[in-house]
Amino acid sequence: MAFTKELWQSIEPIYAAILRHPFLRGLTDGSLPRESFKFYAVQDALYLREFARALSLAGAKAPEDDWIIMFNEHAAGALKVERSLHESFFQEFGLTHEAVASTPMAPTNLAYTSYLLAVAYGRPFHEALAAVLPCYWIYWEVGKELERVSSADPLYKRWIGTYASEEFGSVVRAVLAAADQVAASLTPLEREAMRRHFITTSRYEWMFWDMGLRREAWPGW
């Protein structure tokens, strides 16, 4: 069995909880409050900037030239997606680039990105790869599932299409192939470290959608 399949089996309960989450169900049935989606989209833009940094750090540690290229291209791609959010969603919300950039990170967002950067900076390549993998893989699987159900809301349908696309699928498959190739030469302890990071950041994926639904804020004092 491919190692990535083992990884996925380890998060099946988390993924099932993600699909049941009211945020995602609200995207398909149109019941998600616009303010929750707006909050999520702004936090996602802030997340993508830090995710790009984590990808660049992972690329710097990659043992294969093709992976160095791949992760640096993906880092650039994450920043392009962040910019496209301004063009496709934030203008509709009346948000300027400055307004988004000056928005504080919500607690969950700060915790998630801090974890990613700590692993990407301080741990070996295989661990960094495992930590960033859920953001790719879970979004692709969620996108495909939500596209199957679709949405009557044009705005939410557009968001769903971004992550269900074959173009994004090709990106994810390349990262999965790298993870399997790396894991093949690792010790059981090294693979277990990959699994721990993969599970942790998968949990953060659930928490991120929950953060968006609740419009999570820091305490007021």
Regions found by a protein language model. Give the residues of each.
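Short, charged/polar, low-complexity loop and linker segments
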Residues: 23-29, 116-118, 181-188
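Structural helix-adjacent loops and short alpha-helical linkers that scaffold large soluble proteins
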Residues: 62-67, 187-188, 192-195, 220
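Alpha-helical bundle segments that constitute or directly flank the non-heme di-iron/ferroxidase center
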Residues: 12-17, 32-61, 80-81, 130-140, ...
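Active-site-proximal alpha-helical scaffolds that flank and shape metal-associated catalytic sites
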Residues: 66-170, 199, 203
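Acidic, low-complexity proline/glycine-rich segments
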Residues: 1-24, 166-177
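Acidic, carboxylate-rich catalytic segments that either coordinate divalent cations
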Residues: 194-221
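Polytopic alpha-helical membrane-helix bundles and their juxtamembrane interface segments
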Residues: 156, 182-186, 221
